[in-house]
UniProtKB/Swiss-Prot annotation:
Residues 47-57, 62-72, 107-117 are annotated as: May interact with the chromophore. Residues 18-53, 54-108, 117-146, 147-182 form the EF-hand domain. This is Aequorin-2. It comes from Aequorea victoria. GO terms for molecular function: calcium ion binding. GO terms for biological process: bioluminescence. Belongs to the aequorin family.
Amino acid sequence: MTSKQYSVKLTSDFDNPRWIGRHKHMFNFLDVNHNGKISLDEMVYKASDIVINNLGATPEQAKRHKDAVEAFFGGAGMKYGVETDWPAYIEGWKKLATDELEKYAKNEPTLIRIWGDALFDIVDKDQNGAITLDEWKAYTKAAGIIQSSEDCEETFRVCDIDESGQLDVDEMTRQHLGFWYTMDPACEKLYGGAVP
């Protein structure tokens, strides 16, 4: 991950209205019961149970993925049985992003990479170490966040840093880190028009 093509903007932009809007959009998307609060229970249900069950993960893959989701959102301060409102959620994201960027700068494993490894293992159906556009489309359909084929293809294009026509976990980690943590311009349109 030290290659120049995988370098990422390492400074946060927490006051950027677009960064805040991006996270507010996801907060609302992940608020399964629409009560204005979310909990780790909802995150695991949405990010793990629904998605992974729709992708045919093995029990081992499902457990690994669930553990990664728990650790990731736990890093943002979320807990089972505890509802988090928007102000606490965004503050948790700031802490998570700061911690993750420090790890990334030191070439240490990040929670987003650990989650990416777990998800990649499930999405990469032929286990060749790369995700094809068809595999990506199957995942985005199961996740429900990207609805249009155009947005799915745009996401794939943005993540395909080396322009190989396939995605590897390093590319995915780099682009998601830049999109969710720092507003890196190279990551714009990561979700097409599905996420601001």
